[in-house]
């Protein structure tokens, strides 16, 4: 800590600069979205665990994606709802750092899981005869664990670099949760290294993962076009198109937020883009998979019919 500066012990999240009536409206709307996130992803997890036909590598990774989406929403949305009800209620420094660390961990993990899922589809469609020998359960578990461990370690790097910084005021954080770039703006010390690390992490993880995913799907598209069976081609395209929707939503918003130069987009615009990224993406992911995936639809129908007849 530097000299005679008094370190602040809490932050005040400014959230959304709106009137009380609109705040209550948003509270109800975001609460509804939060319930949809928990129900949607929880349903995906339940269907995969209960139906043995979904005990395949693709759905194994999809279940991990559902867990990440739930965890990511739980790390940000409750605090957002508290801010809407009690705009003047501060968050402690420790709470802010914890929230930032958890969000970064889950965001990095989701980024890596999407790469793993694209690789799984690449092997399934481009090398179908070798799929069972390549994507063994040992390999699947290793890939999933690696995604989680790397996600946590990458977030830990940012946290370790941020904790030594002094925060002497102001304590007003222009965001709806403790986002790393918004927190860095309140530091009284030089944050150049931190900003470089955020950019380096975004370029290496986000851009690297994005291009890896694109390369996988280019190969997949070429393989799909060669499939002679119309039904096989339609099934492969249906599965991959749902994956591409999720990939496009995730990487598109994340790259604009952390890779695009700061002067290209207004700060408020990026704040609302992050709202979409942290609130709407986890809600849309299970909808995309359930609406575009006949296997998930079939499992859901069987479960509902079984419940009616019992």
UniProtKB/Swiss-Prot annotation:
Q: What GO CC annotations are associated with the protein?
A: membrane; plasma membrane
Name the SUPFAM superfamilies on file.
Family A G protein-coupled receptor-like (SSF81321)
Q: Name one GO biological process term.
A: detection of chemical stimulus involved in sensory perception of smell
| Subcellular location as annotated | Cell membrane
PROSITE patterns assigned to the protein according to its UniProt record, in alphabetical order: G_PROTEIN_RECEP_F1_1, G_PROTEIN_RECEP_F1_2
Q: Which residues lie on this side of the membrane: Cytoplasmic?
A: 49-56, 120-138, 219-235, 292-310
Query: Which UniProt keywords are listed?
Result: Cell membrane, Disulfide bond, G-protein coupled receptor, Glycoprotein, Membrane, Olfaction, Receptor, Sensory transduction, Transducer, Transmembrane, Transmembrane helix
Listed transmembrane segments: 25-48, 57-78, 100-119, 139-157, 196-218, 236-258, 272-291
Q: Which residues are glycosylated?
A: 4
Spell out the InterPro entries in the cross-references: GPCR_Rhodpsn, GPCR_Rhodpsn_7TM, Olfact_rcpt
Q: Which residues lie on this side of the membrane: Extracellular?
A: 1-24, 79-99, 158-195, 259-271
Q: How does it sit in the membrane?
A: Multi-pass membrane protein
**GO MF entries:** G protein-coupled receptor activity; odorant binding; olfactory receptor activity
Function comment: Odorant receptor.
What family does this belong to?
Answer: Belongs to the G-protein coupled receptor 1 family.
In Swiss-Prot or TrEMBL terms, this protein is called Olfactory receptor 2A25
Species whose genome carries this gene: Homo sapiens (Human)
